[in-house]
């Protein structure tokens, strides 16, 4: 919200929605333009014909249904990454977007970093020749998110791979011209999440090892 609120020449934040009314009201009062509204049901928000763009910032499991509904309501959509918690939900988003004729983007802000822009331009110019192999890495030590529902697999769908790994994969695929994979193989593991000792050394607060459900 603060970043968007600071772009007053580009957008106006006219409506907010949260299933917890107090949060929606607080965000509306702090970041909204005069006369901004707040809702507890996104379906009611989507009925407002004055809204042009919807920014989806919910737990991952809700990305797809809200995005699909927004397209059906004639809105442009920016959705936070990852697109969804599974491929079926992501495909539903793509199908709704193509049918709507509206604009759609995922919150991969690292594409706009200066170093990433430089790398992408070099790849486009052919400075690295024919790129046929690439590795991507994402490391964040002892910084497991402890806010919201991050360790809840049902609501988030996964851990660091869809949290920070997705940024590394996006930049890699983007620089390689977003080719279409023939097949995908992956694996994850978990160990630290269930360790009380690891939880105590976290940079952004501790978590309950008993409720940690995603890979780490």
Ranges and model annotations:
Residues 21-22, 103, 137:
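Catalytic cores of eukaryotic secretory-pathway lumenal/extracellular enzymes that build
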């Amino acid at each position: 919200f603060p970043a968007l609120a600071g772009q007053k020449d580009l957008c106006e934040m006219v409506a907010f929605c949260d299933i917890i009314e107090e949060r929606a009201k607080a965000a509306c009062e702090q970041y909204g333009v005069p006369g901004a509204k707040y809702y507890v049901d996104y379906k009611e928000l989507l009925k407002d014909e004055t809204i042009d763009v919807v920014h989806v910032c919910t737990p991952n499991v809700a990305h797809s249904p809200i995005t699909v509904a927004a397209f059906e309501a004639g809105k442009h959509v920016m959705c936070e990454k990852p697109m969804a918690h599974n491929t079926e939900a992501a495909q539903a988003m793509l199908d709704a977007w193509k049918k709507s004729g509206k604009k759609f983007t995922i919150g991969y802000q690292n594409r706009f970093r200066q170093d990433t822009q430089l790398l992408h331009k070099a790849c486009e110019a052919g400075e690295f020749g024919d790129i046929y192999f690439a590795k991507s890495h994402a490391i964040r030590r002892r910084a497991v998110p402890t806010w919201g529902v991050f360790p809840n697999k049902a609501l988030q769908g996964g851990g660091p791979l869809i949290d920070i790994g997705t940024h590394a994969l996006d930049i890699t695929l983007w620089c390689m011209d977003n080719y279409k994979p023939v097949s995908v193989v992956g694996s994850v593991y978990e160990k630290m999440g269930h360790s009380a000792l690891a939880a105590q050394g976290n940079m952004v607060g501790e978590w309950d090892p008993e409720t940690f459900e995603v890979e780490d």
